[in-house]
């Protein structure tokens, strides 16, 4: 893409912030106060786009219920944030690796070191999705603070051609990627404290939106009971302790009873909770959960 035609200076995320023009003259504390004041604008901006975020959650839920995947895709900071959110889903919600996927322009190496030119080719975005054998049941969410990254545009166009559900997260209004997606999520956080450094407010906004999407989807998929992560995989000492505390919180049982139930269920939290609340054995608990597609609340109510 010809850089002369971009005119990035017209983008909100690239303009200078009049409140931070003296950044290099401030004391350390004053500088931190300015950063904090700017960061306060992020949740306010997100509050304005909650309906779009909710729509994206519903679309992603439908894709996963149909056997599809949730795929995040971006370049630079945006790509890294998608990879981060995707990587947290298996341990937090017990979903298999590959159900939620993060792609970054330039491949895994770009997580640690910038890959020159990777974001400037729309064909690379399409190629990365083709490498995943994209199908119409998948959902693709493109991320770009500027809203005009060619890698993301190419990917969203290909996803649309395949018939996927799509969403775009950008921090500039009426952006090109927003026009390529079914749902446009555009929290306008204003100019950055450091001009053009979109790893700041724009990155924070994208991270918060991704948190909301993935957590919202997992709640709707039955991975949460009350506000407890009942599909957590106890793969280390910390998570085993958390699993035990979750069982205690959900059932009111004492610690020893919770541990015993977890031992019988091979550290699987949902059947352990059901065993204690319904006073049934582990196999009966597993069968009841299976009948209710893993939804613990329905299994408790349905009997």
UniProtKB/Swiss-Prot annotation:
Pathway: Amino-sugar metabolism; 1,6-anhydro-N-acetylmuramate degradation; Amino-sugar metabolism; N-acetylmuramate degradation; Cell wall biogenesis; peptidoglycan recycling. It comes from the Bacteria. Keywords: Carbohydrate metabolism, Lyase. Induction: Induced by MurNAc 6-phosphate that releases the repressor MurR from the DNA. Repressed by MurR in the absence of MurNAc 6-phosphate. One of its GO terms (molecular function) is carbohydrate derivative binding. It catalyses: N-acetyl-D-muramate 6-phosphate + H2O = N-acetyl-D-glucosamine 6-phosphate + (R)-lactate. The keyword Lyase applies. Its EC number is 4.2.1.126. One of its GO terms (biological process) is N-acetylmuramic acid catabolic process. CDD domains: SIS_Etherase. It holds the Pfam family GKRP_SIS_N. Residues 60-223 form the SIS domain. The keyword NADP does not apply. The active site is at 88 (proton donor), 119. PANTHER family: GLUCOKINASE REGULATORY PROTEIN (PTHR10088), N-ACETYLMURAMIC ACID 6-PHOSPHATE ETHERASE (PTHR10088:SF5). Homodimer. Belongs to the GCKR-like family. MurNAc-6-P etherase subfamily. A lyase-type mechanism (elimination/hydration) is suggested for the cleavage of the lactyl ether bond of MurNAc 6-phosphate, with the formation of an alpha,beta-unsaturated aldehyde intermediate with (E)-stereochemistry, followed by the syn addition of water to give product. Specifically catalyzes the cleavage of the D-lactyl ether substituent of MurNAc 6-phosphate, producing GlcNAc 6-phosphate and D-lactate. Together with AnmK, is also required for the utilization of anhydro-N-acetylmuramic acid (anhMurNAc) either imported from the medium or derived from its own cell wall murein, and thus plays a role in cell wall recycling. This is N-acetylmuramic acid 6-phosphate etherase. It comes from Pectobacterium atrosepticum (strain SCRI 1043 / ATCC BAA-672) (Erwinia carotovora subsp. atroseptica).
